[in-house]
UniProtKB/Swiss-Prot annotation:
HAMAP family: Thr_tRNA_synth (MF_00184)
Swiss-Prot/TrEMBL cofactor(s): Zn(2+)
Organism ancestry: Bacteria, Pseudomonadati, Pseudomonadota, Betaproteobacteria, Burkholderiales
Reactions this protein catalyses: tRNA(Thr) + L-threonine + ATP = L-threonyl-tRNA(Thr) + AMP + diphosphate + H(+)
Physiological role: Catalyzes the attachment of threonine to tRNA(Thr) in a two-step reaction: L-threonine is first activated by ATP to form Thr-AMP and then transferred to the acceptor end of tRNA(Thr). Also edits incorrectly charged L-seryl-tRNA(Thr).
Subunit annotation: Homodimer.
Binding site for Zn(2+): C333, H384, H510
Name listed for the protein in its UniProt record: Threonine--tRNA ligase
Entry's cofactor comment: Binds 1 zinc ion per subunit.
Alphabetized NCBIfam families for the sequence: thrS
Length: 635
């Protein structure tokens, strides 16, 4: 007798072993038809999986997030099936699920074209309509490797040969196509109804630039056409908001080949940067942080002591001088520990909070660079808190409160929080980890925050909290972190004198709110579509004269506003006023101040707000008061 416990708590009993599909059918024909897989004691499995023991089971349908993942994974295999039918000489490699879709990497003797993608997608639709059953079989490693070698699929054979002998090898087949996969997959290809191929990009075999370059075909798949249409619309909107495009249009920054992954900031872009940096500086100063500055280049010995030289060297820029090896810092933490160590610290000094807008460099692969979002040179709003074990919860609470407030000020109201817990390989005792993890939970609870826990995702030296902000298009970006470190203080010899005169290691909290300033500015630009809030805008207002006779008044007005702290410029060009208004409207300036003879004579100004809103004529003081009202919450 097999007892199956369902999500509603009910138990069904079967005289013999049953498949997931049979359990679904016993519940009802509708569920049997909708079933894509099952969650058996928490593990995602195929509908053909046989249950021969008492277990808990949830039937997975297209209404579940797991169901969508199964659909996307199966659609990746459908893509490979179609490619092999149309281009038999192409070799298949891997095809995982990614955010909003999937990809599959192929080795082929010529580049795939947009026309090829159309043909492949059409063939996928034809194969899906055949509604061919998807079957799974478990084989030995040698049998699987031999099969793929026999059909000329060298990449698949190489993958299999790297799998431990003891691991289970699953092969999935539909129609004339067989692929290696952990699964699960849909029961038949007819379940795959809504998908689209998006683009082709380059990729290296096993992600190593020394290996052969492959072709990566990206696709998206959904359960409903409305969802796919909404996603494609979001992509169109994202293209309009692309920070690289807006950076050029708004004259904020540029990148060039002579300095890959580094940013050339233009005056308006640097003005935007300064608003973000000065705001962050004010917030950390108010929160009791002490700002410091540490060297960009430090001797190899320090990086060896911290462990970065052994574990991170390939991502570091190094140099040599007078027979000494140096590294340009990829992160600020070892330098902050040196400041902490400079002098004898007492428990009375703690907590010590060191902040730095630290300039870091990492040798990212050139193919991974992407505008401001992935760079080699960046500044981080970095800080490290040195405290006692008794203080780390209160410090975590204070940081959570600060981070949430900052995100709100920048216009981000939806924050997803994730707590990464102990990995298998880790430093410290289970007792220490349990205290650290529970402390972070308590800090989040005290702030009224909810979070998702990620078992095994913590760093080997401690658990961490991640803060993921959601932008105007619903995209999620990880920006902030709060990382507890049980290792670096010991590695670098940081200690303080406790109340009983013993020497103890401080608890070290690594923390950042925006993370990379460059990346955060890219996110901000796209979130606001370049129309920055008044407090962030490079220029808050532009004064426009209609004719030469108002130039002197326009210039005087500009100077008056500048003295009151307004970021303002005058456009006195001998151009039609309609032309000047249109140009500055495209530049997304919050306020355009138009002055003609009437405004000059009355010492007033005609105000146009962003979006073409005519606010009418008002005294200069009234405009300044309106602007101050916009800014008041950030003063």
């Amino acid at each position: 007798m097999v007892s199956i416990r369902l999500p509603d708590g009910s138990v069904r009993q079967y005289e013999h072993p049953v498949t997931v599909a049979e359990v679904a059918a016993s519940i009802g024909p509708g569920l049997a038809k909708a079933a894509l897989g099952g969650k058996l004691d928490g593990e995602l499995v195929d509908t053909s999986t046989v249950i021969d023991r008492d277990a808990s089971l949830a039937i997975v349908t297209d209404k579940d997030a797991d169901g969508l993942d199964i659909i996307r994974h199966s659609t990746a295999h459908l893509l490979a099936y179609a490619v092999k039918e149309l281009y038999p000489d192409a070799q298949v490699t891997i095809g995982p699920v990614i955010d909003n879709g999937f990809y599959y990497d192929f080795s082929y003797n010529r580049p795939f074209t947009p026309e090829d993608l159309e043909k492949i997608e059409k063939r996928m639709q034809e194969l899906a309509k055949k509604d061919e059953p998807v079957t799974r079989r478990v084989v030995s490693r040698d049998e699987a490797a031999g099969y793929f070698r026999s059909i000329g699929e060298k990449y698949k054979a190489e993958i299999i040969e790297s799998i431990p002998q003891s691991d289970e090898i699953k092969l999935y087949s539909h129609g004339g196509f067989t692929d290696l996969c952990r699964g699960p997959h849909v029961p038949s290809t007819g379940k795959l109804k809504v998908f689209k191929l998006m683009k082709v990009a380059g990729a290296y075999w096993r992600g190593d630039s020394k290996n052969e370059q492959l072709q990566r075909i990206y696709g998206t798949a959904w359960t409903k056409k409305e969802d796919q249409d909404q996603y494609l619309h979001m992509l169109e909107e994202a293209e309009k908001r692309d920070h690289r495009k807006l950076g050029k249009q708004l004259d904020l920054f540029h990148m060039q080949e002579e300095s890959p992954g580094m940013v050339f900031w233009h005056p308006k872009g640097w003005a935007l940067w300064q608003q973000v940096e000065q705001y962050m500086r004010r917030r950390v100063n108010e929160a009791g942080y002490l700002e410091i500055k540490t060297p960009m280049i430090m001797d190899r010995s320090l990086w060896e002591a911290s462990g970065h030289w052994q574990n991170y060297r390939e991502n570091m820029f190094t140099t040599e001088s007078e027979k000494r090896d140096y590294a340009i810092k990829p992160m600020n933490c070892p330098g902050h520990v040196q400041v902490f160590k400079h002098g004898l610290r007492s428990y009375r000094d703690l907590p010590l909070r060191y902040a730095e807008f630290g300039s870091c460099h990492r040798n990212e692969a050139s193919g991974a660079l992407h505008g401001l979002m992935r760079v080699r040179g960046f500044v981080q709003d970095d800080a490290h808190i040195f405290c006692t074990e008794d203080q780390f919860i209160s410090e975590s609470i204070a940081f959570n409160t600060l981070a949430m407030s900052v995100y709100k000020d920048f216009g981000f109201d939806h924050i997803d929080i994730k707590l990464s817990l102990r990995p298998d390989q880790r430093a410290g005792t289970d007792e220490t980890w349990a205290r650290a993890e529970q402390g972070l939970r308590d800090a989040l609870t005290a702030c009224g925050l909810t979070w998702e826990e990620l078992p095994g995702e913590g760093a080997f030296y401690g658990p961490k909290i991640e803060y993921h902000i959601k932008d105007a298009l619903g995209r999620s970006w990880q920006c902030g972190t709060l990382q507890l470190d049980m290792v670096l203080p010991e590695r670098l010899g940081a200690e303080y004198v406790a109340e009983d005169n013993s020497r103890r290691r401080p608890v070290m909290l690594h923390r950042a709110i925006v993370g990379s300033m460059e990346r955060f500015l890219g996110i901000l630009i796209e979130h606001h579509a370049g129309a920055m809030p008044v407090w962030l805008a490079p220029y808050q207002a532009i004064v426009l004269n209609i004719a030469e006779s108002q130039a002197e008044y326009a210039q005087s007005l500009t100077q008056t506003l500048q003295k009151q702290g307004v970021r303002v410029a005058a456009d006195l060009r001998n151009e039609k006023i309609s032309y000047k208004i249109r140009e500055h409207t495209l530049e997304k300036v919050p306020y355009l101040l138009v002055v003609g003879d009437k405004e000059r004579d009355a010492q007033t100004v005609a105000v146009r707000a962003r979006g073409g809103v005519d606010l009418g004529v008002m005294p200069v003081e009234a405009f300044v008061e309106r602007l101050q009202e916009d800014l008041r919450s950030f003063k």
